[in-house]
């Protein structure tokens, strides 16, 4: 068999020329597509760059023509402005008892449960660190005191004989202490235990209620007005605690017929709990003056209550007319008696003056002797009360026996009383 073969100048077969041209055309198309893609990408980048430059350009053709105007225009076109308009709206703090302080009204959150104290115990801590409430007189005192007072009144504790004087059992007191530390006042508690814990709360304060007053100031306080001016020197917390305690003692005195506790007795048992001194003898002497101060304040409170009760009574016209008639008849009788006695007064005037002088001297001597005997009795009573408290504190710490350093033998009880008695006898003999 024979066939025809065509040869070209470029070499190769003539039948493959058409396929070569197709291949070169496809490559050209691919290159054009790549070039177009690159151009489109470059155009996109240029467009984005142009927009960013236009948004941040500075217009130097403004009226002011300054640099400040250009900067303000650039800042105006920026999406995020400079923090130039800043205001301090509120300052919020957190307190354990009151929650968040300083929050707006719509964001305030009430804490449902409040602990009675910031510490583990409600005894031996300052009143500032405890949750406080207001009593009927407006005194801000720890809530635990108000709870104990309410329970004492509800159980008729003020009518118990020897209230605040009879010491409770230590085992029962420790159990009630644990309950009070959790803000719970047990039911059916012994009123003497409750009264003893009220005294213990004042006694175990970091600083006494009356420690802000010097012993010299308390010693020089003799009248009711001086006592009122003296307690004004106390801080608000101590002043509120003292007013609350005085009102409590006044309530006790009002039930004197049942509890056998007068103003002097209740002041005597509270006095050693109001001050704290390192020297026991100095504390004992200072307690006597504190007792007199408390007694004066109690008497003043009772007098004010009596005046308020008397002033609240209604006005009765019939009673006033009867009293006026009685007073007129009494005045007439007095006039008759005075007229009859004018003749005899001139004769025995000198004798009566002599008798009055003698009676006055005798009364002064008896009064001074009675005051000295009263001072001795109050001093002895406070000594016993003070020593009993020291013994109770030592027994609570050791739980076994009373320490020898705090025993009654460490204090010259007999010698001090004997010196006072000798002074009394010498003054009487003179």
From Swiss-Prot:
Ranges of compositional bias, category Low complexity: 316-326
Composition-biased stretches (Gly residues): 9-18
Biased composition (Acidic residues): 347-356
Sequence ranges of Basic and acidic residues compositional bias: 357-371
One Gene Ontology biological process: signal transduction
Documented effect of changing residue 88 to A: Reduces binding affinity with ARAC3/ROP7 10-fold
CDD domains in the cross-refs: CRIB, RhoGAP
Keywords: GTPase activation
Region (Disordered), start-end ranges: 1-36, 307-372
Signal peptide: none
Keyword Transferase: no
UniProt cross-references to InterPro entries, sorted A to Z: CRIB_dom, CRIB_dom_sf, Rho_GTPase_activation_prot, RhoGAP_dom, RopGAP1-5
Site (Arginine finger): 165
Domain Rho-GAP: 125-310
CRIB domain segment(s): 80-93
Keyword Metal-binding tagged: no
Molecular function per GO: GTPase activator activity
Function field: Acts as a GTPase activator for the Rac-type GTPase by converting it to an inactive GDP-bound state.
Description of how the protein assembles with itself and partners: Homodimerizes via its Rho-GAP domain and forms a tetrameric complex (2:2) with ARAC1/ROP3, ARAC2/ROP7, ARAC4/ROP2, ARAC5/ROP4, ARAC7/ROP9 or ARAC11/ROP1.
The protein, known as: Rho GTPase-activating protein 2
Species this protein is from: Arabidopsis thaliana (Mouse-ear cress)
Classification of source organism: Eukaryota, Viridiplantae, Streptophyta, Embryophyta, Tracheophyta
Encoding gene per record: ROPGAP2
């Amino acid at each position: 068999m024979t066939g025809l073969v065509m040869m070209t100048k470029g070499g190769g077969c003539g039948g493959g020329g058409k396929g070569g041209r197709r291949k070169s055309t496809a490559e050209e198309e691919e290159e054009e597509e790549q070039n177009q893609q690159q151009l489109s990408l470059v155009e996109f980048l240029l467009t984005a760059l142009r927009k960013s430059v236009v948004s941040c350009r500075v217009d130097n053709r403004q009226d002011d023509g300054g640099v400040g105007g250009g900067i303000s225009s650039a800042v105006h076109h920026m999406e995020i402005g400079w923090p130039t308009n800043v205001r301090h709206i509120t300052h919020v703090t957190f307190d354990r008892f009151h929650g968040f302080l300083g929050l707006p009204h719509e964001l305030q959150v009430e804490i449902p449960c409040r602990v009675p104290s910031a510490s583990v115990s409600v005894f031996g801590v300052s009143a500032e660190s405890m949750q406080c409430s207001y009593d009927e007189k407006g005194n801000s005192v720890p809530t635990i005191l108000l709870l104990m007072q309410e329970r004492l009144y509800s159980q008729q504790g003020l009518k118990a004989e020897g209230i605040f004087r009879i010491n409770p059992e230590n085992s029962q007191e420790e159990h009630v202490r644990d309950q009070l530390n959790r803000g719970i006042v047990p039911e059916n508690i012994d009123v003497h235990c409750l009264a003893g814990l009220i005294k213990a709360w004042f006694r175990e304060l970091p600083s006494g209620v009356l420690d802000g007053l010097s012993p010299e100031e308390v010693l020089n306080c003799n009248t009711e007005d001086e006592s009122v001016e003296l307690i004004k020197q106390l801080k608000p917390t101590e002043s509120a605690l003292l007013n609350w305690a005085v009102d409590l003692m006044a309530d006790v005195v009002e039930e004197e017929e049942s509890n056998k506790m007068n103003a002097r007795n209740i002041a005597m048992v509270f006095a050693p709990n109001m001050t704290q001194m390192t020297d026991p003898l100095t504390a004992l002497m200072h307690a006597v003056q504190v007792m007199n101060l408390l007694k004066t304040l109690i008497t003043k409170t009772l007098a004010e209550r009596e005046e308020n009760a008397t002033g609240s009574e209604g006005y009765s016209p019939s009673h006033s007319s009867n009293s006026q008639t009685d007073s007129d008849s009494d005045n007439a009788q007095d006039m008759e008696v005075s007229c009859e006695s004018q003749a005899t007064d001139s004769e025995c005037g000198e004798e009566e003056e002599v008798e009055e002088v003698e009676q006055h001297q005798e009364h002064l001597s008896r009064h001074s002797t009675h005051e000295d005997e009263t001072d001795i009795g109050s001093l002895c009573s406070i000594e016993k009360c003070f020593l009993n408290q020291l013994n109770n504190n030592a027994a609570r710490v050791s739980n076994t026996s009373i320490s020898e350093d705090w025993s009654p033998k460490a204090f010259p009880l007999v010698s001090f009383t004997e010196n006072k008695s000798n002074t009394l006898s010498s003054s009487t003999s003179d």
